[in-house]
Amino acid sequence: MGAPRVVAKGMGEVARRIRELGAENGVPLLEAPPLARALHRHVELDQEIPGTLYAAVAEALAWVYQLTTWKKSGGQYPVPPQDLPVPAELVPEVVNG
């Protein structure tokens, strides 16, 4: 088994549709713009994530695992991770306008 792979990506309307399909299918949504931007910029579809993003993706996947456990067992809702460790050089600048 290799590293996690990017299975969908997009910007604007495509990203909105991905989120919409996820919601319709019960897929948890984690808001992590720096990680999303780094993955979008540096990883192609069906490509494994680079080692430099392992820690950030591992934290996100750990939260998903906690959600799965919570759904089965109840208890306190898992706190989504904040400030995922995404190397600054991988996060593209956001240009408005």
Task: Locate the predicted segments by residue.
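Divalent-cation
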Residues: 1-97
